[in-house]
């Protein structure tokens, strides 16, 4: 108001409203740039098949909500915010926490332990309280005699399966799995009790570390169940034959002049009782050999088929007139046979998916699912086993088989402490970035060094021990190149990949998978006489002289350069050293490649070559986790 008591008119602003609006508005380009920069800074989530699950041992059954958690009729009375329909809602605290934008999370310092592995989200922990409980449970079992096995099956364990090992003691996964798999299957439910989509058979997941005896853990109960079913089948066949004889007599009395063709009995040819599926033909040969070895004492008919065999050979094995009890095969080959002959899967009572993380992956999942669905009518038990459980497999099992029984060992997703990991920096002198030269130098130093482990006295008398080394590369093309370079440096190296011929693959695997058999007394005497003759002759023959142009070689050392084809399931019990030519892509590959060592309680040594572009922090944390004996989390 002015001096006269009147209202004064508002003054015009010095700046127009349009200019004020433009000055206060934020630039859209700046916001777009901020969003774009944040999207590039934030790391992408890895694929589910490359990330291990954190809840392997937890059941999929949902617990019912308590009465306190349920919303009552007056639950909406005490609201502190107005929840209008058309008004945009702000993001909840849970959504902010999932996105990583929460203010509370910014204040929390990152844990220094396993920081790089958490950035990769390669592994997640299983509660160590659960691991301790499993250790206490399996400590009560110390012998195979505590299992309710048939006497002939128990005798075959010591005479065939574990004849080359000193102590015949069950491993942790065998202590967990054998009692559970020996239980009688659940009774068949009627259509009223179960829906069409719910499986009508028992499901088991065997999750244990590499080299822990998972094959024997499911093979022993299967053979025991097979022999028990044979007794039941003989009794049923005897009763069925008596019933058919009575019916035939009644028909002859009532219709003496009628001629009716009799139905031919259904043969057991091409109708196995137990099917073991593995992803590769190399695993078919390995698992099939174990099944065949046990059949020498426990009488049953077994066979193995893979793409390495001819169609005529496959037909003679599968459709043998005497029948077949246990079949080891790959999924694609078995599915193609089942399309032409559906009766192949009509009598399957036990189905095993060995290396389930590969068989339930995208490449095998449609074929594996088809086999499970076709054999579901007669199936009693479905068994999945693997050393690594990716998040994708865990989610799939919780969705399809929520009632699956999870049998996990305390050392799941861990590398044994008896395996030592060394690191070689190839950027330093004398390598200067030459990875192949560093690999050759490591092999020469290992080959020239003496053997630290005590050898069998008879093997020491027979001759020098041959050291066997595995070299893992990431690319298939580099296997031949690295093997050729090592041969140029005087190292006996061979390449093993999918491009190799089947006969060459079998010969190479036999050298690196079979442990040496103790020699007989005659072989020891021959070796002693030969060594005595060589030392007594004072002459040097022309063929024994070193030629001037001859290259020196590394004696008593064999090297196999391979890809991940030999990292899964291959029982390389004769290998004591593994060299990682490249740093693995994820922790799953670390576990499988280093899992070729330390099998069945033996020691091993691994060397990883680290270059300029490799993740040294990941290698460091893997090494620290191996030293502590913890899971790679």
UniProtKB/Swiss-Prot annotation:
One of its GO terms (cellular component) is mitochondrion. Residues 50-115 are annotated as: Disordered. Residues 1-38 form a transit peptide. PROSITE patterns: HELICASE_ATP_BIND_1, HELICASE_CTER, Q_MOTIF. Residues 195-407 form the Helicase ATP-binding domain. SMART domains: DEXDc, HELICc. Its EC number is 3.6.4.13. A motif (DEAD box) lies at residues 354-357. GO terms for molecular function: ATP binding; ATP hydrolysis activity; RNA binding; RNA helicase activity. The keyword Electron transport does not apply. It is an enzyme of class 3 (hydrolase). Residues 458-633 form the Helicase C-terminal domain. A motif (Q motif) lies at residues 142-175. Residues 52-63 have a biased composition (Polar residues). InterPro entries: DEAD/DEAH_box_helicase_dom, Helicase_ATP-bd, Helicase_C-like, P-loop_NTPase. Belongs to the DEAD box helicase family. MRH4 subfamily. The Q motif is unique to and characteristic of the DEAD box family of RNA helicases and controls ATP binding and hydrolysis. This is ATP-dependent RNA helicase mrh4, mitochondrial. It comes from Aspergillus niger (strain ATCC MYA-4892 / CBS 513.88 / FGSC A1513).
């Amino acid at each position: 108001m002015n001096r006269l008591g009147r209202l004064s008119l508002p003054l015009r602003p010095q700046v127009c409203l349009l200019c004020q609006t433009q000055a206060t508005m934020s630039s859209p380009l700046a916001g777009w740039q901020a969003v774009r920069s944040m999207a590039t800074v934030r790391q992408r989530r890895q694929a589910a098949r490359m990330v291990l699950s954190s809840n392997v041992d937890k059941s999929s059954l949902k617990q019912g909500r308590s009465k306190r958690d349920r919303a009552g009729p007056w639950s909406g009375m005490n609201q502190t915010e107005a929840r209008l329909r058309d008004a945009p809602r702000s993001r909840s605290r849970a959504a902010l926490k999932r996105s990583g934008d929460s203010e509370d999370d910014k204040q929390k310092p990152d844990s220094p332990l396993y920081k790089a592995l958490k950035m990769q989200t390669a592994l997640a922990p299983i509660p160590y309280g659960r691991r301790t409980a499993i250790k206490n449970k399996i400590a009560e079992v110390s012998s195979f005699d505590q299992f309710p096995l048939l006497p002939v099956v128990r005798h075959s364990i010591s005479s065939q399966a574990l004849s080359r090992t000193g102590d015949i003691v069950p491993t942790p996964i065998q202590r967990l799995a054998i009692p559970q798999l020996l239980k009688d299957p659940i009774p068949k439910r009627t259509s009223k009790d179960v829906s069409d989509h719910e499986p009508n058979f028992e499901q088991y997941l065997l999750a244990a570390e590499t080299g822990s005896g998972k094959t024997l853990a499911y093979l022993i109960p299967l053979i025991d169940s097979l022999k028990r079913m044979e007794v039941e089948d003989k009794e049923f066949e005897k009763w069925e034959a008596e019933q058919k004889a009575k019916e035939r007599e009644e028909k002859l009395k009532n219709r003496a002049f009628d001629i009716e063709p009799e139905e031919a009995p259904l043969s057991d040819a091409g109708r196995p009782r137990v099917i073991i599926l593995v992803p590769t033909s190399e695993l078919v040969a390995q698992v099939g050999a174990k099944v065949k070895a046990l059949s020498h004492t426990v009488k049953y008919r077994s066979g193995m088929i893979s793409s390495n065999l001819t169609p005529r050979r496959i037909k003679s094995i599968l459709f043998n007139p005497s029948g077949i009890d246990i079949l080891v095969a790959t999924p694609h080959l078995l599915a193609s046979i089942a399309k032409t002959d559906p009766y192949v899967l009509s009598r399957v009572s036990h189905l095993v998916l060995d290396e389930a993380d590969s068989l339930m992956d995208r490449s095998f999942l449609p074929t594996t699912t088809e086999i499970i669905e076709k054999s579901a009518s007669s199936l009693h038990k479905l068994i999945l086993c693997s050393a690594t459980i990716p998040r994708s497999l865990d989610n799939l099992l919780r969705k399809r088989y929520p009632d699956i029984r999870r049998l996990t060992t305390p050392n799941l997703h861990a590398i044994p402490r008896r395996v030592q990991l060394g690191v070689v920096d190839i950027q330093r002198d004398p390598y200067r970035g030459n990875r192949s030269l560093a690999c050759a130098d490591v092999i020469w130093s290992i080959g020239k060094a003496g053997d630290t482990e005590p050898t069998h006295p008879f093997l020491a008398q027979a001759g020098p021990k041959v050291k066997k080394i595995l070299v893992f590369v990431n690319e298939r093309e580099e296997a031949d190149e690295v093997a050729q370079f090592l041969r140029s440096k005087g190292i006996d190296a061979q390449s093993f990949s999918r491009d190799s011929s089947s006969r060459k693959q079998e010969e190479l695997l036999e050298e690196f998978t079979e442990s040496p058999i103790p020699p007989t007394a005659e072989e020891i005497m021959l070796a002693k006489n030969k060594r005595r003759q060589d030392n007594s002759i004072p002459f040097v023959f022309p063929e024994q002289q070193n030629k001037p142009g001859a290259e020196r070689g590394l004696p008593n050392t064999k090297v196999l350069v391979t890809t991940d084809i030999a990292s899964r399931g291959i029982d390389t019990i004769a290998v004591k050293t593994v060299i990682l030519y490249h740093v693995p892509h994820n922790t799953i590959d670390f576990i499988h490649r280093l899992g070729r060592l330390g099998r069945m309680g033996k020691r091993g040594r691994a060397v990883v070559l680290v270059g300029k572009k490799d993740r040294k922090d990941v290698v460091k944390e893997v090494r620290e986790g191996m030293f502590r004996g913890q899971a790679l989390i």
